[in-house]
């Protein structure tokens, strides 16, 4: 039994223009061998996530959903840069390949990174994973361990320090009552 998340069929209405993405990747100097096998990961709370599996590369593409969005709700550049800068101090971050801010490619900003094999924690795990109660417990412990490691990253002397919301931002969110 495999306990690795592999994605599933791309949902109707969420198809990806793979040819446009491939052309763009090639313009970035990325060599792609073979035809892409495209799958989509489900169960996320925000951005759409696709797997593009080539003979020589296994990639993940992240993009915002279609429709009206708050200006900062799906900031692909921020998501990309946080991970790219975090990788210097935290080894569990995937290698960032490229960020596209040219909406003429697929209609929105997106970024591509190398895939890391594993499980994507989410509210409903894919039934094909067939996890036992012990498997789910181990996954939860692993997620907590990684979050603890992440929060111990000394970001203050890295480019990450420049992208925060500033001192007191979280307190403001927690203690500001809606009017």
What is the role of each PLM region?
Residues 175-179:
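Conserved small/polar residues in nucleotide/adenosyl-binding loops
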Residues 39-174:
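ATP-binding pocket architecture of kinase catalytic cores
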Residues 1-3, 7-9, 14, 25, 35, 49, 57, ...:
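Intrinsically disordered, low-complexity regions
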Residues 4, 33, 140-141:
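Short hydrophobic/aromatic segments of transmembrane alpha-helices and their interfaces
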Residues 2-30:
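Juxta-kinase regulatory segment immediately upstream of eukaryotic protein kinase catalytic domains
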Residues 28-34, 90-92:
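Short secondary-structure junctions
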């Amino acid at each position: 039994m495999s306990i690795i998340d592999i994605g599933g069929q791309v949902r109707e209405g969420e198809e990806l223009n793979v040819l446009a993405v491939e052309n763009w990747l090639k313009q970035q100097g990325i060599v792609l061998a073979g035809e892409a096998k495209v799958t989509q990961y489900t169960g996320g709370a925000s951005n759409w996530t696709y797997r593009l599996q080539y003979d020589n590369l296994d990639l993940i593409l992240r993009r915002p959903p279609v429709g009206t969005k708050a200006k900062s709700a799906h900031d692909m550049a921020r998501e990309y840069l946080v991970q790219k800068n975090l990788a210097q101090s935290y080894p569990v971050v995937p290698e960032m390949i490229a960020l596209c801010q040219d909406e003429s490619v697929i209609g929105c900003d997106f970024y591509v990174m190398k895939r890391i094999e594993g499980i994507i924690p989410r509210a409903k795990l894919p039934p094909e994973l067939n996890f036992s109660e012990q498997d789910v417990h181990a996954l939860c412990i692993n997620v907590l361990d990684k979050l603890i490691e992440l929060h111990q990253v000394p970001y203050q002397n890295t480019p990450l320090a420049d992208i925060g919301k500033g001192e007191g931002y979280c307190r403001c969110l927690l203690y500001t009552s809606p009017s």
